[in-house]
Amino acid sequence: MTPGELFTDGPDHVLNAGRRTLTLVVQNTADRPIQVGSHYHFAETNAALGFDRQAAHGMRLNIASGTAVRFEPGQQRTVELVDYAGERKVFGFRGLVQGGLDASGQSHKETT
């Protein structure tokens, strides 16, 4: 048993069933660890994470709510992202969107 692991009587739980996903390779080019939470707009993560930010626009990590992925210095890992749902509005983070993700499809500012 893994700490925090849950056993249920029903079928397996599938996270974000039916939503579009994307698999990306991410490289931490920083000299410190970077941790990204489950609902953080992935395109707006720390600039020291190297990956295709345009492809990640409007997506977050496809992991359980309240969890995170940690990228150690120099580490490269593959992550799965999932589309935001609902109204698809993003505010805060690095301030690169500040509104609807789908507004003309070009609400994403430069992230370098």
Swiss-Prot record:
GO terms for molecular function: urease activity. Pathway: Nitrogen metabolism; urea degradation; CO(2) and NH(3) from urea (urease route): step 1/1. This is Urease subunit beta. Keywords: Cytoplasm, Hydrolase. Pfam families: Urease_beta. Heterotrimer of UreA (gamma), UreB (beta) and UreC (alpha) subunits. Three heterotrimers associate to form the active enzyme. GO terms for biological process: urea catabolic process. Belongs to the urease beta subunit family. Its main location: cytoplasm. It catalyses: urea + 2 H2O + H(+) = hydrogencarbonate + 2 NH4(+). Its EC number is 3.5.1.5. It is found in: Cytoplasm. It comes from the Bacteria. The keyword Electron transport does not apply. Transmembrane segments: none annotated. It comes from Polaromonas sp. (strain JS666 / ATCC BAA-500). It is an enzyme of class 3 (hydrolase). GO terms for cellular component: urease complex.
